[in-house]
């Protein structure tokens, strides 16, 4: 045992011993655990610590498995027990017995025997029970078997000099009254929510809320279980942390704010170990872990661990190092209660007339505009997806409740499409479009009745007929894009002239997003294949064979012209978009995010200022939904915020490629290299899609069915016939 400088003994402090026990799990410094360790359990055979009358006691403490002293401490009546060493090799199974110390005075605890105090000037003892006597030498405390139910009174401390016995008794009575008041304050403090630190919430077996089972102090926190409960259930693992100091009564700080000079120790999160923000679902937890637990329970998530459930959730690790399966398992084992989670409330709610006018874009276009009702078999991508019939379209951008903002930014693949989330709405529209493609491009009759498979499992076919392929790309796909917009409830309030401007911008952008993505997912980057939405691919390694077998006979171009026209565009798309998609390994949800960003672009050329503000508000909500999606679904990544930025930066490359794609389309149309189609021409020419006040097309427009009808309530209150098309300014031939 290392040498210790013995402090000078002074006046004895009255004291009593409270014995409890706890189980420590890891190394903890003595000073941070407690200021009073009085004895060891019966499993130890080394010397124990005791309180003697004005005599310093030096002892050591060893575990039951090893006789090597691991703790050295000294006791003086002046300052109580002060540790001079540290725990260097504390085993997990070591049980310690603690005494409660408040400041510089040992206070009595419930169920503890009284130890009278004395000094060199004390009076001789009398027969009265309340008389101050010299403290006898105490034997080492016996092992804890049971705790008495009533505490013995604490005798007054210090030297009392009286001549008259009555005065002495009166003085002793005053001391006892002060001690009782002090005990009441102590009990109020140790059972206050501010000092207990809610350790009972961390215990898997609930402790009875009575004095002899649990105790805290203003400077240190101790936890204990009685022997009867120990025999019926294993002892809990308690975290020994410093209790919060109570603010002074004279403090002018607000409730819940520590006074100046108060030191408040923040309890650790029971899941990851970082600083907690309070009690969440029954345990001390940080905001991130509590939000994760709430999302998992509300969305009924089912995670799996790639390491067999052996991951470690630590506070110093980044979000990407937290396995969601192990993190949720630790939430449950720490005591988080699923029943405490409040599930989502009504997502629609009711708004006042003022809020409706503020949110509704119709107030800017047409005050009397009516809102149509969309009736569609809305689906989800999962096998359990149902239908949502007769969903009323909102009059404007709905306010998404905060409870939904933290949960709806997930993939939304297993929930209904009736929820108010911009990202969720886009995902539902993309899922419905995928099912429509299954019907149009099915290779056999059985495919009409099958659920759409994943992209990797789709069967590709090589180009055999250019005319059939162009029919798919320039007759079916533009109509699917229009249906994608028409079914989007967030765009329903817009007048038809504004929808057409958005559509002409979106239909080209959409092709520039999907084709590089499909090419990458089907391995086209390595094979130099160009994959189209109709599951047809062109092999750019051998374009000549398509001229030899007559697949491109309807193109009216020779081999050299075709190569010079399309090969640079393909190479540019794969280098600037496809390779970046491959590098980030983007998901189908992120593909939908890109489609939403190009659809809700407030910078579209020629749109009305009211439309621009309207699109900006929807896009801002989409960005918020995307942020929540990355916080939840992409939390396993090392830097999800960087990935989110990389996805957003793809929009610039998509816009550049869409310009090249538009130029190719104009060239094919102007030189009559593809079969004529009225809707295809209207899609590229603004003059052919402008709407006159009476609802008819302009006289110079080509004849043919309009891709969308013009309802009376959706025309808007202004005309903008002079606006050029969004692509005309870039592709003027």
Curated annotation (Swiss-Prot):
Disruption phenotype: RNAi-mediated knockdown increases expression of potassium channel accessory subunit mps-2 and suppresses age-dependent memory decline. Residues 266-343 bind DNA. Residues 113-130, 165-185, 371-382 have a biased composition (Low complexity). One of its GO terms (biological process) is negative regulation of transcription by RNA polymerase II. PROSITE patterns: NR_LBD, NUCLEAR_REC_DBD_1, NUCLEAR_REC_DBD_2. Keywords: DNA-binding, Metal-binding, Nucleus, Receptor, Transcription, Transcription regulation, Zinc, Zinc-finger. It is found in: Nucleus. Transmembrane segments: none annotated. Residues 444-687 form the NR LBD domain. This is Nuclear hormone receptor family member nhr-66. It comes from Caenorhabditis elegans.
């Amino acid at each position: 045992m290392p040498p210790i400088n013995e402090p000078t003994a002074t006046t004895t402090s009255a004291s009593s011993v409270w014995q409890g026990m706890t189980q420590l799990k890891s190394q903890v410094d003595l000073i941070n655990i407690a200021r009073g360790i009085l004895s060891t359990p019966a499993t130890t055979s080394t010397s124990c610590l005791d309180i003697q009358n004005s005599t310093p006691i030096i002892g050591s403490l060893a575990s039951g498995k090893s006789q090597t002293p691991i703790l050295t401490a000294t006791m003086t009546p002046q300052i109580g027990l002060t540790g001079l060493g540290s725990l260097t090799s504390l085993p997990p199974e070591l049980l310690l017995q603690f005494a409660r110390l408040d400041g510089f005075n040992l206070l009595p605890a419930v169920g503890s025997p009284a130890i009278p105090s004395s000094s060199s000037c004390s009076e001789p003892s009398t027969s009265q029970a309340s008389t101050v006597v010299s403290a006898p030498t105490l034997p080492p405390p016996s092992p804890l078997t049971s705790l008495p139910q009533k505490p013995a009174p604490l005798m007054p401390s210090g030297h009392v000099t009286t001549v008259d016995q009555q005065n002495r008794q009166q003085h002793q009575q005053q001391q006892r009254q002060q001690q009782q008041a002090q005990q009441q304050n102590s009990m109020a403090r140790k059972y206050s929510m501010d000092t207990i630190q809610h350790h009972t919430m961390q215990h898997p077996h609930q402790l009875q809320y009575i004095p002899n089972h649990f105790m805290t102090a203003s400077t240190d926190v101790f936890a204990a279980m009685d022997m009867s409960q120990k025999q019926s259930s294993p002892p809990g693992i308690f975290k020994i942390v410093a209790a919060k100091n109570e603010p002074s009564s004279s403090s002018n700080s607000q409730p819940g704010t520590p006074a100046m000079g108060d030191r408040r120790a923040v309890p650790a999160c029971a899941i990851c170990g970082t600083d907690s923000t309070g009690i969440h679902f029954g345990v001390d937890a940080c905001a991130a872990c509590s939000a994760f637990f709430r999302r998992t329970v509300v969305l009924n998530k089912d995670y799996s661990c790639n390491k067999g459930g052996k991951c470690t959730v630590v506070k110093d690790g980044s979000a990407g190092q937290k396995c969601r399966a192990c993190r949720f398992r630790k939430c449950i084992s720490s005591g988080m209660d699923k029943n405490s989670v409040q599930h989502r409330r009504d997502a629609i709610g009711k708004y006042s007339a003022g809020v409706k006018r503020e949110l509704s874009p119709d107030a800017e276009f047409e005050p009397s505009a009516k809102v149509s009702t969309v009736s569609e078999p809305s689906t989800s991508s999962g096998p359990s997806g149902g239908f949502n019939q007769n969903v009323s379209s909102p009059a404007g951008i709905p306010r998404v409740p905060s409870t939904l903002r933290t949960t709806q930014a997930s993939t939304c693949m297993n929930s209904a499409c009736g929820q108010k989330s911009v990202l969720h709405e886009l995902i539902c529209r993309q899922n419905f479009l995928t099912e429509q493609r299954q019907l149009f491009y099915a290779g056999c009759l059985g495919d009409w009745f099958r659920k759409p498979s994943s992209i990797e499992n789709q069967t590709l076919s090589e180009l055999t007929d250019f005319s059939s392929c162009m029919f798919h790309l320039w007759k079916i796909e533009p109509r699917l894009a229009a249906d994608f917009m028409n079914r989007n409830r967030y765009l329903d309030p817009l007048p038809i002239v504004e929808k057409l401007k958005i559509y002409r911008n979106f239909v080209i952008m959409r092709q520039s997003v999907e084709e590089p993505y499909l090419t990458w997912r089907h391995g086209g980057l390595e094979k130099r294949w160009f994959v189209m939405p109709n599951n047809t691919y062109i092999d750019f390694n051998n374009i000549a064979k398509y001229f030899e077998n007559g697949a491109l006979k309807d193109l009216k171009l020779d081999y050299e012209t075709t190569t010079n026209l399309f090969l640079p565009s393909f190479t540019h798309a794969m280098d600037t978009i496809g390779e970046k998609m491959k590098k980030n390994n983007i998901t189908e949800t992120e593909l939908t995010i890109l489609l939403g960003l190009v659809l809700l672009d407030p910078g579209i050329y020629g749109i009305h200022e009211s439309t621009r503000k309207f699109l900006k508000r929807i896009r801002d909500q989409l960005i918020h939904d995307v942020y929540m999606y990355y916080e939840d679904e992409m939390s396993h990544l090392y830097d999800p915020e960087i990935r989110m930025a990389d996805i957003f930066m793809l929009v610039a490359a998509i816009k550049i490629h869409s310009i090249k794609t538009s130029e190719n389309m104009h060239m094919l149309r102007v030189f009559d290299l593809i079969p004529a189609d009225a809707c295809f021409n209207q899609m590229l020419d603004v003059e052919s899609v402008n709407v006159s006040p009476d609802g008819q097309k302009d006289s110079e427009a080509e004849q043919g069915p309009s891709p969308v009808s013009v309802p009376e309530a959706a025309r808007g209150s202004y005309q903008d016939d002079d606006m050029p098309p969004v692509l005309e300014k870039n592709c003027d031939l």
